[in-house]
């Protein structure tokens, strides 16, 4: 594997682009934008920070923003893999970075942690059309720089919301597409009033039937922002919210059904008394989330700048579930709702200074989370023994988190700089689990009514050092070397399904950036060494959460090449690929009633090869045609690398056309956009799961295996018209 990585590095002739669009160049940026960036700069990597990262500007998002979620919009970036329950990138979707699932990808919005405090999942479905209110995204791979929230074990996304508009504007966006997809969005800005105040907002609606049967989405969102600024001050008050009603499509399909009826969805299926199959019409997921942020950025004396942010998030909702009656009618079906009601609030802060000799940042955060988990019956009848809306579990989770960090980038010479980053993070977490809520270790710690539940109370203290070197050899070549440690607490689901340990990661990065006449290249080698990594088993618990288990030693060793080639004035080619080795050491698993050793196995959900191309053709100033290609190599859905759990590789191509239809005197910014997804109609699945169960056979346990898959849509089209006044 090491020879492959070395040869690939030497033989690569691809080219790299890692720059923000011209609107973000320092020479053209306004003072208001400079102050605005203070909010995210404390967490973001700079050009001479010794970590691999990718910046995505608003202009890059607009081209492909027709209705799909952020994971779909960034799927062509290095080491990223996305998957969608409904098969279209609308509704429930998620990303993996370097093989690490969404619970291990740190996401912040204006520096505020967005990962759910207990599950650490990122529910993009709660942010429909949020990309329309995004100014830029930075994706860091590996541990990266210190950030707020849970540790990054595969990567991090740092999102900056919309910047102020100097002039008044009004915009309308409408999208139509396959599977009855429709998106309507309106946005506005007052421009600066009396040079100090600006108000802006967006209101969006997205509806789609989805590719999978009964996987529809009904999504609504808004974004409101008020800004006050003067020469040294910027204050932003934000309120953004989403309401999602989605059909449940997270069940997947088994291998045989995948061949015969790939759009099948078992959710809500039940039998009539006459034996006919029917589907419960309210098998829905219904959740609302409100987010509030107040950010105050201030230029102080002697070159210092400060940021203080307050935030509050309130989420509440449920999924309604029909528990199927057996075909023999001996067991009566029932209906329940499983609720979440949670509050998350806190403060972030940073103090920074930049000089010719050094850059320094001091920052941190204090956050509090309260979550309620409860289930209600939605029927009444003596055959069940419960009344309407009786609770069959009633649990909670509480989490307090504090972190503080100090970063120093010191220029030893004009060519060599040293980077240091120290973080202390403290977590206090307590929770209860009832058996019906999806967990509990079975120990008698307390009760709710007649139900036994489990209590936990945990405290973690983590110290995470990072350091590195950046060397500018000449105007064409930069090199960097870095080390970073990350430590991470288990999730609620981990506690509900076992007795987990916190995990630790030591991350080593070695990179080269080349800048030449018509191409740019970034080559990055990484070695990520884990202790007690919580890995996906491929199995799910009784409420659909993915089950993870600690393993002893494991690692990820890989090479990332990210490039851009400027062919001529009309053509350019962006290319990136990742080749990696992802291994468990001495993996053991209970199989056929025995603890069996499987040796060194490939980490599940970790393809050895990920590759992307974006070929851009601009025949004139008004038209851009892009072919966006995505290859994901084969991967295992199980940690034991069972042959039946191998997910096939796939190669997908999307065609994106943007036509500038601006009409002087009517709209100076009017665009017609077309996105043809999967133009070659490939039948593929980009995610799935694996499970085992034991039965007695001839007096001895026999293990049986199964898999399930999430099929994705074939060729489908989205057509959008953006008009800005």
Language-model-detected regions and their locations in the chain:
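N-terminal periplasmic "start-of-domain" segments of outer-membrane beta-barrel proteins
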Residues: 32-65, 94
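Extracytoplasmic beta-strand/coil segments of soluble accessory domains associated
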Residues: 71-113, 135
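Short acidic/polar hinge/loop motifs at secondary-structure boundaries
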Residues: 113-141, 160
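Transmembrane beta-barrel wall of Gram-negative outer-membrane proteins
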Residues: 176-207, 212-249, 284-287, 292-302, ...
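Face-selective signature of the C-terminal outer-membrane beta-barrel domain
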Residues: 234, 286-441, 470-472, 476-482, ...
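Membrane-embedded beta-barrel scaffold of Gram-negative outer-membrane proteins
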Residues: 299, 305-311, 472, 478-484, ...
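Gram-negative outer-membrane beta-barrel transporters
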Residues: 414, 527, 549-640
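C-terminal beta-signal and adjacent terminal beta-strands/loops
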Residues: 487, 573, 583, 633-636, ...
């Amino acid at each position: 594997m090491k020879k492959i990585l070395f040869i690939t590095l030497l033989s690569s002739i691809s080219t790299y682009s890692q720059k923000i669009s011209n609107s973000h160049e320092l020479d053209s940026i306004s003072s208001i934008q400079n102050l605005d960036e203070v909010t995210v700069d404390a967490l973001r990597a700079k050009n001479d920070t010794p970590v691999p990262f990718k910046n995505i500007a608003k202009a890059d998002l607009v081209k492909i923003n027709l209705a799909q979620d952020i994971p779909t919009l960034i799927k062509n970036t290095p080491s990223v893999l996305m998957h969608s329950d409904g098969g279209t990138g609308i509704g429930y979707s998620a990303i993996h970075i370097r093989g690490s699932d969404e619970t291990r990808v740190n996401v912040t919005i204006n520096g505020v942690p967005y990962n759910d405090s207990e599950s650490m999942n990122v529910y993009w479905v709660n942010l429909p059309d949020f990309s329309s209110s995004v100014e830029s995204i930075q994706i860091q791979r590996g541990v990266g720089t210190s950030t707020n929230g849970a540790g990054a074990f595969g990567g991090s996304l740092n999102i900056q919301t919309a910047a102020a508009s100097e002039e008044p504007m009004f915009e309308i966006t409408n999208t139509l597409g396959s599977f009855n997809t429709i998106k309507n969005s309106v946005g506005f800005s007052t421009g600066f009033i009396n040079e100090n105040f600006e108000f802006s907002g967006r209101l969006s609606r997205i509806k789609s039937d989805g590719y999978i049967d009964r996987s529809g989405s009904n999504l609504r969102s808004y974004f409101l922002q008020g800004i006050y600024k003067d020469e040294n001050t910027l204050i932003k008050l934000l309120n953004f919210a989403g309401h999602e009603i989605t059909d449940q499509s997270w069940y997947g399909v088994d291998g045989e059904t995948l061949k015969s009826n790939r759009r099948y969805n078992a959710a809500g299926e039940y039998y009539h008394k006459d034996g006919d199959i029917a589907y419960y019409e309210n098998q829905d997921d219904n959740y609302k989330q409100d987010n509030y942020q107040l950010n105050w950025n201030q230029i102080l004396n002697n070159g210092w700048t400060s940021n203080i942010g307050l935030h509050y998030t309130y989420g509440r909702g449920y999924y309604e579930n029909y528990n199927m009656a057996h075909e023999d009618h001996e067991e009566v079906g029932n209906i329940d709702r499983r609720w979440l009601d949670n509050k998350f609030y806190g403060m972030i802060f940073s103090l920074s200074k930049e000089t010719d000799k050094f850059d320094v940042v001091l920052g941190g955060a204090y956050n509090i989370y309260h979550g309620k988990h409860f289930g209600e019956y939605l029927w009444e009848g003596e055959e069940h023994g419960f009344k309407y809306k009786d609770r069959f579990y009633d649990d909670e989770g509480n989490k307090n988190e504090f972190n503080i960090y100090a970063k120093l980038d010191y220029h030893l010479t004009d060519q060599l700089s040293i980077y240091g980053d120290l973080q202390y993070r403290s977590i206090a977490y307590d929770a209860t689990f009832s058996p019906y809520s999806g967990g509990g270790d079975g120990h008698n710690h307390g009760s709710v009514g007649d139900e036994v539940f489990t209590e936990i109370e945990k405290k973690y203290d983590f110290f995470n050092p990072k350091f590195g070197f950046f060397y500018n050899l000449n105007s064409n070549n930069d090199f960097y070397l870095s080390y970073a440690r990350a430590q991470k607490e288990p999730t609620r689901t981990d506690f509900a399904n076992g007795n987990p340990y916190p995990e630790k990661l030591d991350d080593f990065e070695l990179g080269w950036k080349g800048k030449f006449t018509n191409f740019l290249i970034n080559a990055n080698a990484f070695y990520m060494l884990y202790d007690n990594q919580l890995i996906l088993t491929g199995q799910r618990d009784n409420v659909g959460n993915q089950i993870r288990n600690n393993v002893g030693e494991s690692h990820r060793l890989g090479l990332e090449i990210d490039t851009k080639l400027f062919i001529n004035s009309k053509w350019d080619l962006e290319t990136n690929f990742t080749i990696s080795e992802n291994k468990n050491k001495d993996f053991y698993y209970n199989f056929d009633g025995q603890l069996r050793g499987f040796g060194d196995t490939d980490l599940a959900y970790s393809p050895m090869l990920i590759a992307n191309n974006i070929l851009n053709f601009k025949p004139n100033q008004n038209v851009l045609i892009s072919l966006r290609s995505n290859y994901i190599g084969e991967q295992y859905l199980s940690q034991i690398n069972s042959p039946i759990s191998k997910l096939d590789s796939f190669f997908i191509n999307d065609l994106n056309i943007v036509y500038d239809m601006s009409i002087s005197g009517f709209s100076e910014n009017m665009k017609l956009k077309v996105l043809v997804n999967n133009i070659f109609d490939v039948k593929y699945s980009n995610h799935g799961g694996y499970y085992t169960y034991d039965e007695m056979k001839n007096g001895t346990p026999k293990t049986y295996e199964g898999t399930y898959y999430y099929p994705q849509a074939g060729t489908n089209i989205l057509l959008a018209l953006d008009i800005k006044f």
